[in-house]
Amino acid sequence: MKKTFTTLLLALTAMMTWAQTSALELLKADPKRSFGTDYPYHFTDAKLTASPAGYEPFYIAHYSRHGSRYFWSDFLYKGLDSLMTKAHERHQLTAEGEAFYNKFTAAKQELFTGWSELTQLGWEQHQGIARTMYNNFPEVFSKGGNVLAVSSLVGRCVISMSAFCQELAQCNPMIEIRENSSRFTLHAVVPDDRQNPLRRKYPRSKPRFEQNRAQFKQENPLPQTVVARVFTNTDSLPEASRIYYLLSNLYTSLPNIGHEGMMGNILTDEEIASQWEASNLGTYAWVFGPRYETIPILEDILEKADAVVKGESDHIADLRFGHDSYLGPLTVLMGINGADRDPEDPYEVKNCYQNWETCMASNIQLVFYRSQENSDILVKCLLNGEEATLPVPTVMAPYYKWSDFRDFYTARCQSVQPLNP
């Protein structure tokens, strides 16, 4: 028994070491991953595991965040405009700061107009994801069929849905797609939206690492360094207490709006990456707390998939387009790649969740397989186009029996009762 326990412990330690190395190596290979939820979608060339013998895909359940956009609120652009204009007028800018001020001013009208809107890159991301889905699973789409697509009421989600569906229809005009952005379907994409007539409130909780956050030590001289690159001094400037917040948030948003280079050498990708682990802790706390709010999304996935499996629905795909504030918590609720592990050690959080997985246009695809010779329906999960693990018991990962998948997640949904049933 002792030998078995030791072997298991060694195996778990090896897995944790691999996960840590994997996350940090990915960050080193592409420092922009440290932009987290601002990271533009990255198309992968990862090879998918072949279908089990005799099995073919026949249905896909999907949830996606909208694509790349301008910053979600105009306060960033207005705050920077006020800050930089005053500093310019008072001769408090360095040469680097003046260069940035001029570039920002030239783009100001675009930024003031575009805040929160989908960008061209965001449109192209969903086109690419749709075509990749079609090419990866031609058996699902080759004969055409009915697809239901629903989105939140926010414009960038509606346009993301349109980009995806147009591309899918171009792949095969026999695919019939019904697009819907309506209060009738909010429970499937943004269930706690105030306009959702089925809105339910769920309990929230903090991740366990919060009790030990003080153990996390990471010096951050970057704010002072960045401020000194832009300003000779910050006396009497508006937004002075939030200068680094404004500058760093603009910097990480620039790849999404086609303005990389606007800030010159004020910040670098590597400098943002040096603070990633602390940023990742904040994001994990943000997506962990409201995980139960996404129970209606998971219930909708289970219900629609079960209807297809039973022959009560003729859908070949159900598509959902929402926001990072739902996809991230849904990732935790489902425990995708261990996101539900909830470690006590803050240094372990990076091994179960990386905030770049909740990037622009991030998406979950659940692909269903069936066989003429075997009655078991199988499910595979893709996170951003790559095969992912689930906490559902299986002996054939990355494939899971639908019956096990359904029972596991039904129990998980039912284990938490809404505060206002």
Predicted feature residues:
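Bacterial Sec-dependent N-terminal signal peptides
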Residues: M1-A23
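Signature for phosphate-centric chemistry
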Residues: Q20-N146, S152-D318, G322-P421
